[in-house]
């Protein structure tokens, strides 16, 4: 056992309103070279629907094949778009 005092509820509230609460925002602001796509998955809705289908059907994958295929199609389309965008940019700038 440690001799650390138990954290006060005030400390926990401060933790979520202090600098730790904005850590991601600060990181994103300091990383302007990061593309928006690295923080946002356009296929998240399809992924969520797949997971909801699995939960609704007790894990029976055969019942959710349409949702899985929709996710695969979305992901493939997104990856192809990203590849094309990278192909059209130069190594030394925009």
Swiss-Prot record:
Main location: mitochondrion
Stretches assigned to the CHCH domain: 40-82
Disulfide bonds listed in the record: 43-74, 53-64
UniProt feature coiled coil, ranges: none
Location in or out of the cell: Mitochondrion intermembrane space
Segments for region (Disordered): 1-21
Location of the motif Cx9C motif 1: 43-53
Keywords, in A-Z order: Disulfide bond, Mitochondrion, Transit peptide
Motif (Cx9C motif 2): 64-74
One annotated GO biological process: mitochondrial respiratory chain complex assembly
Family of the protein in this entry: Belongs to the COX23 family.
Protein name as catalogued: Cytochrome c oxidase-assembly factor COX23, mitochondrial
Species for this entry: Phaeosphaeria nodorum (strain SN15 / ATCC MYA-4574 / FGSC 10173)
């Amino acid at each position: 056992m440690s001799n650390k005092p138990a954290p006060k509820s005030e400390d926990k509230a401060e933790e979520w309103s202090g600098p730790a609460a904005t850590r991601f925002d600060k990181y994103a602001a300091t990383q302007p070279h990061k593309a928006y796509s690295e923080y946002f998955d356009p296929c998240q809705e399809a992924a969520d629907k797949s997971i909801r289908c699995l939960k609704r059907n007790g894990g029976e994958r055969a019942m959710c094949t349409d949702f899985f295929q929709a996710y695969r199609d979305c992901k493939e389309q997104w990856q192809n778009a990203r590849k094309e965008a990278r192909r059209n940019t130069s190594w030394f700038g925009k």
